Amino acid sequence: MASPAAIDLAVVYEHPTWFEPLFQALDRRGVAYQRLPLAELTWDPAASPPPAPVVLSRVAMSSFLRDPEHPIFFAQALFEHWQGQGARVINASALPIDSSKARQLSLIARLGMKGPETRVVHRQANLVRAAEGLRFPVLVKADIGGSGSGIVRYDDVETLAAAARLGSAPVGVNGVSLVQEYAPRRDGEIIRVETLRGRFLYALRVESPGETFDLCPADACLARPGAAALTMTRFEPPPAIVYQVERLVQAASVEIGSVEYLIDDRDGSARIYDINGLSNFVADPLSVLGFDPHETLVDWLVEEIDRTRKQGAAA
């Protein structure tokens, strides 16, 4: 890392180990950057200038699983503050869509794409009414999720009603829940399409045993005790899917992220069910992909640093 006086890039993050491959790639390229763990930050709304001309957001929605004092909403306000002072905050624009599965599904529908049949509630008492017209089994999901958390399957209306009475169904840290038809994954797999700059980067076929909802493909996820045994292979989605994914991330203002979809085994349709504003990239990328996407990301970061520097000189 560079000295504070020579910083071109600040990387703002929450997880202590996920971004070591990125930091190593930045070191190899000689980028003048600073690591900024969110847990250590405070800021003054009347001051607190940006730490660098370019800031990279690496905020994970799953942060609430690791600390009840999570930084999700803190980071949104901080990034807007820095943007107001002229900083280029990469992927700050992704936080509103990343922090709400309801917003994601609304956007998917507005663009004419297919997601799982879903209803949105903010009170447990409304769960059964929301499920009317949906086929069981249903899933209840927290609106803000991550790493497959906050998802419970209910096979019939009686078990859903019992959960509602107990107040035990999942709810997001924002107080919002989704009631969603369970769409069985064809061949037990999902497809995760990674994007950069609003364009296709690569895709993975992720296969898992059983009905786990934790399908995170990165090293740090796979190493967790109790994590699902996943099989990941590079995959080339049909051009029509790539087109939909690119439209979706561009409309969502996701500069770096991914989209997940499955083939619904009931009718063979592709259903997009998740937009991720944070990508850890695949474990062992050279073996799985034949290239390291961290290097591609750093190429773009260097371009953004140069572009921002030129804009500053011309101002």
Feature annotation, model-predicted:
Residues 60-64, 144-145, 278:
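Short glycine-rich anion-binding loops that position phosphate/pyrophosphate groups of nucleotides
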Residues 214-269, 296-314:
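A long amphipathic alpha-helix within ATP-dependent nucleotide-binding catalytic cores
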Residues 138, 201-202, 257, 271-274:
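Protein kinase-like catalytic core scaffold
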Residues 14-117:
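Conserved N-proximal alpha/beta basic substrate-recognition cap immediately N-terminal to
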Residues 152-249:
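Phosphate-binding site of ATP-dependent enzymes
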Residues 2, 10, 48, 79-85, ...:
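Active-site nucleotide/adenylate-binding loops and adjacent lid/helix of ATP-dependent enzymes
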Residues 147, 276-288:
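Glycine-rich phosphate/pyrophosphate-binding beta-alpha loops
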Residues 10-12, 196:
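Short hydrophobic segments within beta-strands
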